[in-house]
Amino acid sequence: MLNYLWFFLAALFEIAGCFAFWMWLRQGKSALWVIPALISLTLFALLLTRVEATYAGRAYAAYGGIYIIASIGWLAVVERIRPLGSDWIGVALCVIGATVILFGPRFSAS
């Protein structure tokens, strides 16, 4: 269950870091936005390594579903944009895929 905490914290810091770059490069804000961006993205990478997984690629793929949930949450809470029905359908499809990756059977590759 601790994996979910790491996934959600990683998503928060990844989105915050990318949003800070967005504010600088797309919204014309000060280059000082790069400082919290780099700190946030570093924390994102460190937190994602805390996930208990044998293979990095599988951890990243499962994380993708959490990232998408968090991104739609960010859209609603931080940017104050109401998600569309198509957003929620996309979230559901991605979460189903991430769940299959996260909880699917593991067979030997030999």
Curated annotation (Swiss-Prot):
The chain crosses the membrane at residues 5-25, 28-48, 59-79, 84-104. The keyword Metal-binding does not apply. It comes from the Bacteria. Its main location: membrane. It holds the Pfam family UPF0060. It is found in: Cell inner membrane. Coiled coil: none annotated. GO terms for cellular component: plasma membrane. Keywords: Cell inner membrane, Cell membrane, Membrane, Transmembrane, Transmembrane helix. It is a multi-pass membrane protein. Belongs to the UPF0060 family. PANTHER family: UPF0060 MEMBRANE PROTEIN YNFA. NCBIfam families: PRK02237.1. This is UPF0060 membrane protein Pfl01_4105. It comes from Pseudomonas fluorescens (strain Pf0-1). The lineage of its organism: Bacteria, Pseudomonadati, Pseudomonadota, Gammaproteobacteria, Pseudomonadales.
